[in-house]
C-alpha cells in the first residue's frame, strides 16, 4: 500500500484531535504568573486547557505540596467552566511570600494533589528553609510549625532578600565604624 501525503496529513490530524480529547491526557503540568488580580482577589485560576483535560478528576479540596514538604489544603471554587484555587490560597501565598511577578509551576500528582515550584522575581527557584521544620496541617486551618532553626532564624518572617539586604547594611555599618576608628587614630597621632 502506498501512503500519500494527504493520507498521512489526515492520519496526523485525526490522531492529534483524539489526543486532545483523551481523558488520560499527558497534560499534568501548568504554570501561572502571579498577577495583581491574583493577589487582590485572593484566588488563582487554573488554566482552561488543564481544567478541560483534568478538571473532572479534581475533588472539592486539593493539596498543594512544595519541594520542602509544606502541604496546604486548598478549596476549589467552580465558576461556570472555570476552576480557581480559593479558600486557603491566600494563606499558602502568604506563607511562601508569593508576590506579583512570581512564577509558579504546578504538577498534578493524582488524588487531587499538586507539586508546586515557586520562582521569584529573579527567575530562580525559591528555596524555603523548611527542611528542618515540622509542619502539621489540620482540619481547623491552624498550622503548627516547630523546629529550633525556624524559631530562632525565622520569627521575623523576613523574606530571603530582606535578610541578605540586612547583612549588607550590617557590613556597611561595620566598615564605616572601622573607617572612623582609623581616622580617629590618625588624628591622635598627627
Curated annotation (Swiss-Prot):
Region of interest called Disordered, as start-end residue ranges on this chain: 1-25
InterPro entries, sorted: B3_DNA-bd (IPR003340), DNA-bd_pseudobarrel_sf (IPR015300), Plant_B3_domain (IPR050655)
CDD domains registered for this protein in UniProt: B3_DNA
Entry keyword annotation includes Transcription: yes
Keywords: DNA-binding, Nucleus, Transcription, Transcription regulation
A GO term for molecular function: DNA binding
Pfam families: B3
Annotated Polar residues bias: 12-23
Cross-referenced SUPFAM superfamilies: DNA-binding pseudobarrel domain
DNA-binding region of this protein: 29-122
GO cellular component: nucleus
Leader sequence segment: none
Cell compartment(s), UniProt: Nucleus
Keyword Nucleus: yes
Protein name, as recorded: B3 domain-containing protein At4g01580
Protein species of origin: Arabidopsis thaliana (Mouse-ear cress)
Amino acid at each position: 500500500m502506498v501512503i500519500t501525503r494527504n493520507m498521512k496529513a489526515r492520519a496526523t490530524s485525526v490522531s492529534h484531535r483524539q489526543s486532545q480529547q483523551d481523558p488520560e491526557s499527558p497534560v499534568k503540568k501548568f504554570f501561572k504568573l502571579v498577577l495583581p488580580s491574583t493577589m487582590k482577589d485572593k484566588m488563582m485560576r487554573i488554566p482552561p486547557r488543564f481544567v478541560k483535560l483534568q478538571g473532572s478528576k479534581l475533588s472539592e479540596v486539593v493539596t498543594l505540596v512544595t519541594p520542602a514538604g509544606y502541604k496546604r489544603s486548598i478549596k476549589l471554587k467552580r465558576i461556570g467552566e472555570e476552576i480557581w484555587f480559593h479558600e486557603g490560597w491566600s494563606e499558602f501565598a502568604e506563607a511562601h511570600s508569593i508576590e506579583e511577578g512570581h512564577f509558579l509551576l504546578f504538577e498534578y500528582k493524582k488524588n487531587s494533589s499538586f507539586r508546586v515550584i515557586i520562582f521569584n522575581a529573579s527567575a530562580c527557584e525559591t528555596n524555603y528553609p523548611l527542611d528542618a521544620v515540622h509542619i502539621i496541617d489540620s482540619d481547623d486551618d491552624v498550622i503548627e510549625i516547630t523546629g529550633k532553626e525556624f524559631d530562632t532564624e525565622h520569627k521575623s518572617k523576613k523574606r530571603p532578600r530582606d535578610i541578605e539586604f540586612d547583612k549588607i547594611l550590617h557590613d556597611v555599618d561595620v566598615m564605616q565604624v572601622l573607617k572612623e576608628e582609623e581616622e580617629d587614630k590618625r588624628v591622635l597621632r598627627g
